[in-house]
Amino acid sequence: GALALAGCGGVGAPQHIDITLIGFNDLHGNLEPPRQSITVPGALPTERVALPAGGIAHLAGAIATLKARTPHHAVVSAGDLVGASPMVSSLFLDEPTIEAMNQIQIDFNAVGNHEFDRGWRELLRLQHGGCEKFTVREPCQISQPFAGAQFGFLAANVLREDGQTLLPATGLKRFTEGGAQVTVGFIGMTLRSTPSMVTPAGVAGLRFADEADTANAQAAQLRAQGADIIVLALHEGGATTAGATGITEPSCTGPSGDIVPILERLDTAIDVVISGHTHQAYVCDYASVNPQRPFLLTSAGQY
């Protein structure tokens, strides 16, 4: 999904800078199209049109189209980029998916539970590259050596025994136009219950902290670093009663799921929440549910 953000400029600068924020989630290494479609509004008020969707070619084309609309954009994945993948990716330890994302030039991926399927050491290899073997499969079967992700994995609530995060908690991206500059801060994290979903050995020595507490603490730090807009990419999700029409229903009707208690505790400094995990599609103004939480809530379904 994509949305437009407007950031204020300084004195004598343009009143705002238009920024396109492109978010997706739960790709699960689906490089080949799954022969699925999405239903979107047609030319007439009652018309619905089925568009082919899924697979890396459709995703890359959609992202390129959205990027072309404005010189200012950011692309963020809300987790499960890899893991539980079809053989075309999993046979090669999901290196093909990472390399595809490098070609698309995404900016950040918030880790999800499936990023830990092969253990945290293999996750670090996907980020940093190299051919060290941590699994039964051989790494670097395609690219030798494997260079790793050219985008940042974010894991704000995944802590080592010394209290340091396994991967960076946040990232910043700055946009300038004329004399104006807008800084967007990104927080990325997985769901706290990740250890119950993966092999214990794969997360040994790690602690998964509370999502809302972590997001609020990081939001304060990002504001101190000069962030004008804060985006939370959270691999946790829910659903709305809008169902399949969630991408065109702006009111967040009947929100449910494990993400809701987290949303209710988020600091108002957070402007956008890109969610995932439940493979549901919704783009809505959460202020319609709770006026004290006026952020945009999105999830792009799945591959």
Give the ranges of each region predicted by the language model.
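Acidic, metal/ion-coordinating pockets
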Residues: 8-303
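N-terminal export signals
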Residues: 1-7
